[in-house]
Swiss-Prot record:
Effect of residue 137 to A: Decrease in phosphatase activity in vitro. Displays reduced activity in vivo
Function: Dual specificity regulatory protein that can control both sporulation and competence by acting on two distinct response regulators: Spo0F and ComA, respectively. Is involved in the temporal separation of competence and sporulation. Acts as a phosphatase that specifically dephosphorylates the sporulation initiation phosphotransferase Spo0F and inhibits its activity. RapH can also antagonize sporulation by sterically blocking phosphoryl transfer to and from Spo0F. In addition, inhibits the activity of ComA, a transcriptional factor that regulates the development of genetic competence.
Main location: cytoplasm
Phenotype of null mutants: Deletion of the gene induces both differentiation pathways and interferes with their temporal separation.
Entry protein name: Response regulator aspartate phosphatase H
Impact noted for substituting residue 46 to A: Displays drastically reduced activity in vivo
EC number: 3.1.3.-
Effect of residue 50 to A: Decrease in phosphatase activity in vitro. Displays reduced activity in vivo
Enzyme class (EC, first level): hydrolase
Means of activity regulation: Both activities are inhibited by RapH.
Gene Ontology MF terms in the entry: phosphoprotein phosphatase activity
Family membership noted in the UniProt record: Belongs to the Rap family.
Expression induction: Part of the rapH-phrH operon, which is transcribed from the SigA-driven rapH promoter. Activated by the late competence transcription factor ComK. Repressed by RghR.
Amino acid sequence: MSQAIPSSRVGVKINEWYKMIRQFSVPDAEILKAEVEQDIQQMEEDQDLLIYYSLMCFRHQLMLDYLEPGKTYGNRPTVTELLETIETPQKKLTGLLKYYSLFFRGMYEFDQKEYVEAIGYYREAEKELPFVSDDIEKAEFHFKVAEAYYHMKQTHVSMYHILQALDIYQNHPLYSIRTIQSLFVIAGNYDDFKHYDKALPHLEAALELAMDIQNDRFIAISLLNIANSYDRSGDDQMAVEHFQKAAKVSREKVPDLLPKVLFGLSWTLCKAGQTQKAFQFIEEGLDHITARSHKFYKELFLFLQAVYKETVDERKIHDLLSYFEKKNLHAYIEACARSAAAVFESSCHFEQAAAFYRKVLKAQEDILKGECLYAY
């Protein structure tokens, strides 16, 4: 009878697997995952290590869903199914395993655009952070927290965390994708501060790095973020130019990104009064929405149709704003209500315009109240 493989040896291999996941190296991660699964069949009994393995399967699938949304991998369980396997023993977990369980669950909630839920899990994970000794893992924590607070428009808190993450990533060349993503978050925060001149250099640096590593997805995302920055600064011409560049790369290389790009392009054209051209891109965007993960962008396209068609669909606008309210997406409420108000104001429907401007003010108040998310 062959001797059982020590669980410590399998644990080392799981650590290597996680390293490849954090580097977004799918082929290497797949190879190590298969090796770990084979070793576990011959491993000595170790319940903690099996939990660690389950957590890493969950994290592996989160990576795949981010890089290749909608793609299936044989009979593998989905993220939702994997979530059930890691939730069951959670109350028994301590230390590093508890940290991973909470941190990965926060990442899942973030991907579902449940940002308040995500921050709640990250805050619980932070209590276990003293058990984390690896610098890259600390950078991962700061990056994900910064990302969540950015989406909740808690700009100062986001900037505090992202600078800590970037300081680590920049010293590790293998983590160039996380460096690019960190530059995105910094630029987004500068945009929220309305310092557009400070945002663009970070986005251009991200684009240059993405081109250096020849990563089509992040080339497209960099172009998209540059376009969004120009749009926020009011430079419609430069925004449209970069949206179209992002759309070209997306159509050719990363089609799952196309609805997001076309939404940004459509909205900019609508605000610039080029609604006929915008509605062509809206139709193209809706045609590309098949996966459940794009439901959010379907709602946004429907919002544009409701606001900018010849007869404004006020009820539909209110329904969509209610959808955003349920998800605490106050920044989206602010931007969408502002667009609706501007359209009503331009057609001299001042009562409706005033009602939507009040929603803008309410959303701004809710964003400021969001500071309670990180009050201890």
